[in-house]
From Swiss-Prot:
Cofactor binding annotation: Binds 1 zinc ion per subunit.
GO molecular function, one term: isoleucine-tRNA ligase activity
GO annotation, cellular component aspect: cytosol
Cofactor(s) this protein cannot do without: Zn(2+)
Protein known as: Isoleucine--tRNA ligase
Broad class of the protein's primary localization: cytoplasm
Quaternary data: Monomer.
S-S bridge residues: none
InterPro entries noted in UniProt: aa-tRNA-synth_Ia, Anticodon_Ile_BEm, Ile-tRNA-ligase, Ile-tRNA-ligase_type1, Ile-tRNA_ligase, M/V/L/I-tRNA-synth_anticd-bd, Rossmann-like_a/b/a_fold, tRNAsynth_Ia_anticodon-bd
Function noted in UniProt: Catalyzes the attachment of isoleucine to tRNA(Ile). As IleRS can inadvertently accommodate and process structurally similar amino acids such as valine, to avoid such errors it has two additional distinct tRNA(Ile)-dependent editing activities. One activity is designated as 'pretransfer' editing and involves the hydrolysis of activated Val-AMP. The other activity is designated 'posttransfer' editing and involves deacylation of mischarged Val-tRNA(Ile).
Comment text on domains: IleRS has two distinct active sites: one for aminoacylation and one for editing. The misactivated valine is translocated from the active site to the editing site, which sterically excludes the correctly activated isoleucine. The single editing site contains two valyl binding pockets, one specific for each substrate (Val-AMP or Val-tRNA(Ile)).
Source organism superkingdom: Bacteria
BP GO annotations: isoleucyl-tRNA aminoacylation
Length: 955
């Protein structure tokens, strides 16, 4: 047997089948960084229409989690797709660097402020800590393939940012939106005043720990016949008169415990510990209730004639107690915030000396700590006390009197939602914004309608100061307040917030020093981050005053979306964004949120290290982010399978462009019909993909690409052209036509993929266009001539067999469509039936390869007419050695009818060829051996090996 391998055009490419993403991606990341790719993109796109996606600042604390990855990757996909569409789309990352979590972490290392570390050193350490966290998180984000201005992020701790926040506060004050109100603080009943954090020390104290029943009024959700009570645990019985709600943890599940006469509702994770403390026999129910199911239910106060709601709060302890706490907004920081969030009454029943006001039922005139015994007695009388025990624990004390202190509501600074019509203007601006998904508009409308005034002051150390001077007697602001804002902001821009805290009051107001108090409160960190429109969008020249898009998790309707909107309206009466897009939370396969306590966390770092960032990116893009986003090892495995399908498709096309350059491009009109068809199909898909990028529907894009790879390419076109690619002459018009099609398809597809599979797309681009710059410096591939009048609905065929259910528009489109393309669509409908028949014969060991088969097609006259157009090339379309056409009336009994809703009167019979196999093309043909010089070849191969080469027209 002769070896004809050298006469074949075998595929070859450097693009490997094995992705090895975890290792390979790092090389591309390094190249992007070394080439300063982000700067190249900015330079190239300068002057183009702008699209500004404004990054919500991530909190600079701890490792990034899967939710962070989802958020940043979605943003990256949008920015990259906008660049492809011809926009200048800068992406400036941001970090939120002030606030309590950073303070707590610094305290863990250095101790309490004012005790172990002075306040100025403490702030310096907070800056240092934030810097380190930003560096770590930035590296993790870059590893995900996110292109951004990582060298120039915006940080809320930057001196310029802090100064501009002070300037922004000045504008809000000037516009009449700020007033002084109330909030709970540490309170010493001996001093009769609030205490600063530095004036508080912790000592052991014996407290009365009690478990108390709150009977649930609306218990239909449980579908039980006995009463149900939620059990709270508290160490401050005296606060129960101020109760306004019961809080459950947002991430905990709850179960019913049958104690005989009634059910107790307890946290599933704490139920065993709780009932062991109660020392009672119970039956624990199997059904679990999520806290969100219970939110809003009403419960009966244990001894007052009032009902209060069940709410959610992340401050509920998850390692002790019952998983439920009672909420007294006047007596606790978290309780107060919960009260604001849920618009609860905030009434303080206790005077400055810690005595209940006389009008307080059952307890009037009693000192709070002595009233504990009275509260416990009342609970016993009302049969609502489940457990009482004494507990020794660390408790805050006054540093002067060494006595226990309490939380008591006191004055704070607020932004009024009513003054100067702020709420109305905010609502008006909401109507001008495009909210995605559409139902999120209603969500933020309700939140704005129901929200209380915004408490912007905090009694902490690490944050932007409220730079106000207040008259000691009248409470009025200094008459030169606006001028002082300018002066103080200029100082802070040079020295940071320390300029305010270190300075003497006299430095700013001179002789008025004795008449005014300097405010030492800091701003709520949401005010910090919410002012990024004023500090970043308005200031950085590559951005714009109003962002085209804000994109964050759905929780930010209550957070950054709202703080940005309110602060922007408070300054200039306009929303800071044109569009707002929200994504859901990431949950595990059981629909549970990721949390350490549940042990169900899947970290992005682990995914990247194991399977690569592109797999993570593909999962994110393929998931409908408008709801909860489910992730698991199995789901990631499916993403990896999808990735392999895409990679193998791209590899096949690259390998079959071996020896092809742009000089070999064939004009569209001169291409073979099948090649024109697939290019036109690709163009149509590209139109839909670009539209889906524009509307942020990425899961449709992934679905389209997967279907295209599996059905149009891998399941049809690529299989058909293998024969032409391998067996025709190297420079034959037929082969160059197919390579031209592959070139156009790959050029389009690599761009479709680049916002999602960023590393892989760069790898493809290096193979496809090694002398060109990065794929991220390209725009959509529109260079190929548009092929018009093409209908691709595989289920609609023009002719007598058209189903009656198709629309007139579809019918007219078919009549205008290219006739040969309709014939190709017919082939696509018939092909699966032929493949199934061949596969059955394979299993029965009648056939080996599909080229051992010959096919007889029995069809009506219209189908026969259309398939006849392919002539001898019809066999290539069905990847068999021969195809014969017959009238439908001639079909034998063993014929298999094509199962199609619209293509009628078509049946097939597959038989094994009786002819010899050509050793070069593997077709079984009658003419094998007819040439004395090439006895093992068919005439077609003889022509390709030792002649002018075969001529193809269709396939």
């Amino acid at each position: 047997m002769s070896d004809y391998k050298s006469s074949l055009n075998l595929p070859s490419t450097q693009f490997s089948m094995k992705a090895n993403l975890a290792n390979r991606e790092g090389k591309f990341l390094k190249k992007w960084q070394n080439d300063r790719l982000y700067d190249q993109i900015r330079k190239q796109n300068q002057g183009k229409p702008k699209f500004v996606l404004h990054d919500g600042p991530i909190y600079a604390n701890g490792d990034i989690h899967i939710g962070h990855a989802v958020n940043k990757v979605l943003k990256d996909i949008i920015v990259k797709s906008k660049s492809l569409s011809g926009f200048d789309a800068p992406y400036v990352p941001g970090w939120d660097c002030h606030g309590l979590p950073i303070e707590l972490n610094v305290e863990k290392e250095y101790g309490k402020v004012g005790i172990k570390i002075d306040v100025n050193t403490f702030r310096y350490k907070c800056r240092e800590y934030a810097d380190h966290q930003v560096m770590r998180q930035s590296q993790d984000f870059q590893r995900l393939g996110i292109l951004s201005d990582w060298d120039n992020p915006y940080l809320t701790k930057d001196f310029k940012y802090e100064a501009d926040v002070v300037r922004a506060l000045g504008q809000v004050v000037k516009n009449g939106h700020v007033y002084k109100g109330h909030k709970p603080l540490h309170w010493c009943t001996e001093c009769g005043s609030a205490l600063a954090e530095a004036e508080v020390e912790y000592k052991n104290k014996q407290s009365e720990a009690i478990d108390v029943k709150f009977r649930i009024i609306e218990d239909s959700v449980f579908n039980v016949k006995k009463p149900v009570s939620v059990v709270i645990w508290t160490t401050t019985p005296w606060t129960l008169p101020a109760n306004e709600a019961v809080a459950l943890h947002s991430e905990l599940n709850y179960v019913l415990v049958d104690i005989g006469s009634e059910y107790l509702l307890l946290s599933q994770s704490l139920v065993v510990n709780s009932i062991s403390r109660y020392d009672i026999k119970v039956t624990i129910g199997e059904r679990m209730f999520s806290s969100s199911e219970l939110e809003g239910l009403k419960v009966q106060h244990p001894f007052y004639d009032k009902q209060v709601p069940i709410i959610l709060g992340d401050h509920v302890t998850i390692d002790s107690g019952t998983g439920a706490v009672h909420i007294a907004p006047a007596h606790g920081q978290e309780d107060f915030i919960a009260g604001l969030k849920y618009n609860l009454p905030i009434d303080c029943p206790v005077d400055a000396k810690g005595v209940f006001f006389k009008e307080i039922l059952l307890l009037g005139g009693q000192f709070i700590f002595k009233a504990n015994a009275s509260v416990i007695r009342i609970l016993k009388e009302t049969n609502t006390l489940v457990k009482h025990e004494s507990l020794t624990h660390s408790y805050p004390h006054c540093w002067r009197h060494k006595t226990p202190i309490i939380f008591r509501i006191t004055s704070q600074w607020f932004i009024s939602m009513q003054q100067n019509g702020l709420r109305d203007i905010v609502n008006s601006e909401i109507q001008k914004v495009q909210w995605i998904p559409h139902w999120s508009k209603k969500r933020i409308e309700l939140m704005v309608d129901n929200r209380p005034d915004w408490c912007i002051s905090r009694q902490r150390f690490w944050g932007v100061p409220i730079t106000l001077f207040v008259h000691k007697k009248t409470g009025e602001l200094h008459p030169n307040t606006q001028m002082l804002f300018v002066c103080i902001a200029n100082r802070i821009e040079q020295e940071g917030i320390e300029a305010w805290f270190k300075s003497d009051t006299k430095d700013f107001i001179g002789d008025d020093v004795n008449d005014y108090d300097k405010i030492t409160d800091i701003l709520d960190v949401w005010f910090d981050s919410g002012m990024s429109h004023f500090v970043v969008l308005k200031v950085r020249k590559e951005l714009s005053n109003v962002a085209d898009l804000y994109l964050e998790g759905s929780d930010q309707h209550r957070g950054w979306f709202q703080s940005s909107l309110i602060s922007s309206v408070a300054i200039n009466k306009k929303a800071p964004y044109k569009n707002v897009l929200t994504h859901g939370f990431v949950v595990d396969k059981d629909g549970k949120k990721m949390s350490k306590s549940l042990g169900n966390i899947i970290s992005p770092q682990k995914i990247v290290n194991n399977v690569g960032a592109d797999i993570l990116r593909l999962w994110i893009a393929s998931t409908d982010y408008t709801g909860e986003m489910t992730v698991s090892d199995e789901i990631l495995k499916r993403s990896a399978d999808s990735y392999r399908r895409i990679r193998n498709t791209m590899r096949f096309m690259l390998a079959n462009m071996n020896g092809f350059t742009q000089k070999n491009l064939v004009d569209t009109k001169a291409m073979l019909d099948l090649d024109r068809w697939i290019v036109a199909k690709t163009q149509k898909i590209q139109e839909a993909i670009i539209e889906n990028y524009d509307t942020y529907q990425f899961h449709y894009i992934v679905k389209s690409i997967n279907n295209f790879c599996s059905n149009d390419l891998g399941g049809f076109y690529l299989d058909i052209i293998k024969d032409r690619q391998y067996t025709t002459q190297k420079d034959s018009p037929a082969r160059r036509s197919a390579q031209t099609a592959l070139y156009h398809i790959t050029q389009m597809m690599v761009r479709w993929l680049s916002p999602i599979l960023s590393f892989t797309s760069e790898e493809i681009w290096q193979e496809l266009a090694p002398n060109k710059k990065s794929i991220f410096l390209q725009e959509w591939y529109l260079q190929v001539d548009t092929i018009d009048n093409v209908v691709f609905d595989d289920g609609i065929i023009y002719g007598t067999m058209i189903s009656s259910h198709i629309s007139q528009e579809q019918r007219e489109g078919l009549e205008k469509s290219d006739d040969i393309f309709t014939s190709i669509n017919i082939v696509r409908i018939i092909s699966p039936t032929i493949r199934q028949a061949i596969e059955k014969l394979r299993k029965d060991k009648v056939l080996g390869a599909s080229l051992e088969a010959e096919v007889d097609i029995y069809c009506n006259l219209k189908v026969k007419e259309k398939l006849s157009k392919f002539g001898e090339e019809l066999r290539f379309m069905f990847i068999t050695s021969d195809v014969r056409l017959h009238s439908f009336e001639e079909k034998p009994n063993n014929a298999i009818e094509v199962d199609s809703d619209v293509l009628q009167q078509v049946a097939i019979v597959v038989v094994k060829s009786e002819h010899s196999k050509c050793v070069r093309c593997w077709h079984h043909r009658k003419d094998v051996g007819s040439n004395n010089k090439y006895l093992e070849l068919c005439c077609r191969c003889v022509e390709n090996v030792d002649g002018d080469g075969e001529v193809r027209k269709f396939a």
